[in-house]
Amino acid sequence: MKVWMAILISILCWQSSVWAVCPAWSPARAQEEISRLQQQIKQWDDDYWKEGKSEVEDGVYDQLSARLTQWQRCFVSEPRDVMMPPLNGAVMHPVAHTGVRKMADKNALSLWMRERSDLWVQPKVDGVAVTLVYRDGKLNKAISRGNGLKGEDWTQKVSLISAVLQTVSGPLANSTLQGEIFLQREGHIQQQMGGINARAKVAGLMMRQGNSDTLNSLAVFVWAWPDGPQLMTDRLKELATAGFTLTQRYTRAVKNADEVARVRNEWWKAKLPFVTDGVVVRGAKEPESRHWLPGQAEWLVAWKYQPVAQVAEVKAIQFAVGKSGKISVVASLAPVMLDDKKVQRVNIGSVRRWQEWDIAPGDQILVSLAGQGIPRIDDVVWRGAERTKPTPPENRFNPLTCYFASDVCQEQFISRLVWLGSKQVLGLDGIGEAGWRALHQTHRFEHIFSWLLLTPEQLQNTPGIAKSKSAQLWHQFNLARNQPFTRWVMAMGIPLTRAALNASDERSWSQLLFSTEQFWQQLPGTGSGRARQVIEWKENAQIKKLGSWLAAQQITGFEP
């Protein structure tokens, strides 16, 4: 009873999650969006199954297909299966291909495994499914998966694949096998190399004419022997004896989801002879083959690897002004998981870069993780039917603006606060952008150093600042008063690197103000252009006013 209740809760949670991400579209727009994506996927299917070519990465195709199904669940009572390949398959399978249900995560897999025994895990080899029919010891027929009931006659093509056994004996002499035609790889590490569009490459080789030599780059992984020996060990032994050795080598007994997870992680990082996109867990006990039907296999499930790149919906386009006044564009996303990291925002770059990408809310973009786990945009894979892009702010900001607060300076002013609080400047631990926004909103700073005047009571009564952290924050602000002079100058945004500033040996504000352009130009990494920027900076009225204010606060190096 508890198990069924857990399953029911899981289903309800799944349904809730589906409806929670339904787009806020009118019926007319929903129909248009669904129709457009449906037509595109149909075109990809036609290219894939009729001509053996792919205009889209396998992972992108899978995720956009899932997105279409999600939209259909939101707006159509009965989602239609857009992928019914091949369109002209006419050969009946002796045993139907059931397909495999995907598990969302380890918990879902654990629930499924709980009521089952004699379970085995295999790699989910990434290729094209096939039926192999042996009669009287010879390969009699090879049929593409098609729609699960009918497929293409691939006998002639498969007979040219040297890795596929053309003759067998013993129990296999009159058998029907199901498996995956795959692209042979030498030491393929899925974690490092990804999917390499293997499925599309296999389909292309099988569909094209006159490519008999290249077919030898293919092989087959047998994953099912309908009506075969009852014991999995006997099944594996007979297949290996016949020459289908991969099945025995890559099939392991498992008792629980933890064991599956260990094997899954092992194969994710190991050198394998094929591309994989997850694992399949199957029960050794199967119904008679006459009961097999597409979409109705209860004895096996798949747990796919998390894609290296995820398709994410753009929810909003936002503009940020950095401390130097440059405007950057950020895409706010419907959350996706990448390598155990929840990604909700991705930096697009400059306004010009955003315009080149042509990204609007409602578009679907491909996101991956670059170095140090930073999200990046790889591609725009689908653009919505209705596209409204926001207008970027006027480019009125520069490195000498917004040291003092104003309505138009909000974003650059906050960026300056975030910068001066960073480890490499004043090292104000425990406060980031959200904290600075809370302080400024409550206490209405006049300039970027106004926080020095805050009292413990003011900090404690600031909404958004935890009372338990307010004393620590006040302590950090007080410690900042003792930071070296060069750190304060960096906080003021002097256009020099730390190395150049240290080499200048400037130790007071008055000394810095009297230094000439020639003096700055001789510093390491500082040319004439940078030297002129320093002169413009120190002669700026806002900078002079800040210097006088810091002198009044008796900050080291600024005293008269």
UniProtKB/Swiss-Prot annotation:
It comes from the Bacteria. The active site is at 124 (n6-amp-lysine intermediate). Keywords: DNA damage, DNA repair, DNA replication, Ligase, NAD. InterPro entries: DNA_ligase_AS, DNA_ligase_B, DNA_ligase_CS, DNAligase_adenylation, DNAligase_N, NA-bd_OB-fold, NAD_dep_DNA_ligaseB, NAD_DNA_ligase_OB. Its EC number is 6.5.1.2. Gene3D superfamilies: DNA ligase/mRNA capping enzyme (3.30.470.30), Helix hairpin bin (1.10.287.610), Nucleic acid-binding proteins (2.40.50.140). It holds the Pfam family DNA_ligase_OB. The keyword DNA damage applies. The keyword Magnesium does not apply. GO terms for biological process: DNA repair; DNA replication. One of its GO terms (molecular function) is DNA ligase (NAD+) activity. PROSITE patterns: DNA_LIGASE_N1, DNA_LIGASE_N2. It catalyses: NAD(+) + (deoxyribonucleotide)n-3'-hydroxyl + 5'-phospho-(deoxyribonucleotide)m = (deoxyribonucleotide)n+m + AMP + beta-nicotinamide D-nucleotide. It is an enzyme of class 6 (ligase). Belongs to the NAD-dependent DNA ligase family. LigB subfamily. Catalyzes the formation of phosphodiester linkages between 5'-phosphoryl and 3'-hydroxyl groups in double-stranded DNA using NAD as a coenzyme and as the energy source for the reaction. This is DNA ligase B. The gene is ligB.
